[in-house]
Amino acid sequence: MIARCRHSAFIATLTLVFLLLPGMAAVAADKMVAKTATGNIADRWVLWPKAGQTAEFEAALKQHAAWRKKAGEPFTWLTYQPVVGSDLTYYVIRSDDHQWKDFDADDAWSKKAKADEAYEQQLGPHVARAEHYFEETDAAHSHWTDSKDYIYSGVTSMRLKPGARGDMMIALDKIQKAVMDEKWPYPYRFAWLMGGDNRLRLIIPMKSYAEMADPNPSVRAMLTKGLGSAEAADSALKQFSGSFEDEQYTVYASRPDLSTQP
């Protein structure tokens, strides 16, 4: 936003990923959206307020978001806060669904509107630390539903083992085909993080905490049917999860009061 289940064989399933999939309410009435229709790149800032200045930070962020909206910025920014984890002090501010050329247009607006200066005057004094990332959605392996009713996002961040991307993608192809063949009703999105280590992120939107319940049918049951056998399902899941060195999971809550959404 600155101008610029068990710990056994089934942790080798998508315990780290799809078993974290919330048992969301049916989404058949929602329209499935291909992220490539508009763009699949997100701009993502992570900001930490200075110690003891959370209230001041939020007031300044609200002011700066209003300034950017009034100044006609082409990007729309959404703000999120973690609600689980060891660090609950940071804010994630992101703008989604862009093509790369959109960043040139936003940079041009930023220079003309002097957005850097406005940031430094309004929000900068209350920021202790900032990190910046891009995120590229893998639309071919995602099953996304747009809805204005999402409040929470469950995010699993997985660090890929060196040289494991090929095997991981083969497994993901099998899983995605089963998801589509079985008409799995739950939305999710895979995205590669640009900046830092080589991480694949799984984002699960939720309209309430109730939607964090396990899906029904379970992921394994769905894959067993879609891939033809329990052995094939377990093999694909093991191949997928075995491609990662570590994983982190957290839940974020939307903060529309600190965003520039329409």
Predicted regions and their residues:
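Bacterial N-terminal signal peptides
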Residues: 11-23
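Short S/T/G/P-rich N-terminal loop/turn motif that feeds into the first structured element of a domain
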Residues: 27-262
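Bacterial N-terminal signal peptides that target proteins for export
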Residues: 1-14
